[in-house]
Every structure is written in C-alpha cells, then in structure tokens.
Amino acid sequence: EVCRKTDIDTKRFKERMLLSVISSAKNEMILPEEFELNAGGDFVQLKIAKVYKEYEAQMRANNALDFDDLLVKTVQLLETQPDVRENYQERFRYIMVDEYQDTNTVQFRLVSLLAGKYRNLCVVGDDDQSIYKFRGANIRNILDFEKEFSDAKVIKLEQNYRSVGNVLEVANSVIRNNKGRKEKTLWTDNEKGEKIRLRQFDTAYDEAQFIAEDIKDETAQGANYSDHAVLYRTNAQSRLLEEKFVAMNIPYKIVGGINFYSR
C-alpha cells in the first residue's frame, strides 16, 4: 500500500530493503524529515525518504507501531515529559546492560535517560566481540563510554578460566588486528595445551571430509568418539558434517539443537 501510494517500483526497490533502511534510520533516531534532509540530491535516498514519510503516515492512521517504534517512542516520551522520566528514573535506580557492544544509538539514548538521575549504571561488554554493525550496533557506545560517563570505573576482565594458553595466544594475535578497540591481553593460569592447527579448505565439503577422516584416524589410534567436539557458527553448517558422520559410521550428538534432517 505504501509503495503503491508513493509510486515505487518494487522490482527495483524491494519491500524488504525499504523496511531495512527505515529500521536502520530509526535505530539512529533519524525521523522522516531528517532522513529527507540527509538525502540531499541523491535520487535513491529521496525515493526512500518518500516511502519513509508515507510509511509513518500509514502507521499513525492505523494507530500502529512497529518494533523499532517501541524504543523510539519511549525515548521521545522520556525526553519530552520530565514527570514521566522522573517516575522511571525512580523506579529503575540501578541499571545493568549486558552485551553492551551490540547496542545501537536509540538503546544508548534510552539507557542514558533512565540512568541520568542516579547514574547507577553497569554495562558489560567486549568491543572485540562486536559483530552486529550490519544490524545497527554502534561500537562507539562502548568505546566512548568513559567520555559519556566521566565518573565511570572500568574493570578489565582479562583472565580467562576456560581456555588453555595456546588458544589465548592465537586469540590475542587475531583480535590485535581489530580496528576501533580497547587494548587488552587475555591470559590464563591454565596449562599451555596443544598447539593450534589451522587448516583452510576450498569447499565446505572438503572441510567436512577432513573432519570426519581426522576423527576416524584418532579413534583408530585409541581415542574415544566422545573426545571430539565440532563447533560451528550457524546451524546450517551441520548438514555436511552429519552426512559425513553417517556415511562413515561416526556416532554423534547435536548439543543445543536437533539433527539437520529432523528440523
């Protein structure tokens, strides 16, 4: 309906793309008027600005809010209504935010408003684990925390209790190359452990084949199947691994999920 009213070619401007841009703008507290000003003379941005404005008009007409509005409208309410802000500052005197490196601008504004009176704010995060920029996360929230809250006390949690020394040495050598980070060095009292081996493969098929064969070789030399674990980033990656395990009669169990073909 919005695209029809704004004469948008949905073959060129996909609805999902338009909604994503609008969502990103709201995460930055950029409302339709400001979005249009920022567009300048850019044809594409002006088209999106037109859609954004109509989208908001349709939302108002239907007395509706989208997910991003739940934060945007809350921030606007707290900024413009001192009595409401005072009420919630009294209600939430102590605030803790986890995974702070993944917060966006509107979330930062909300936390700042709520903590503005008593300043009892504790945030926990790791700038080296910031991976959600594509989803609107603003790394400056954690990097500039001491500037925004000058009386803050920073506690670095650099000791690792889970990993062996060699794992941390590799981790430090990798994250040291990150841009925009707070300097830190992970360390442990644990043993050095086995050296890390790095193998790269041309295809996911080759990778799964190598892993399955490696497990077979280890068990042939006396190791147990239960001595092995395979970590993967996304659930879809388990398919090829499971195929290889089944083909080579390797017993396995999916932890924290279900077998690929049972989904």
Q: How would you label these PLM feature ranges?
A:
Residues E1-Y94, R119, I139, K195, ...:
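A basic/glycine-biased coupling hinge at the interface between accessory DNA-binding modules
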Residues R16, E90, M96-V97, Q101-R263:
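Conserved motor-region signature of P-loop NTPase helicases/translocases
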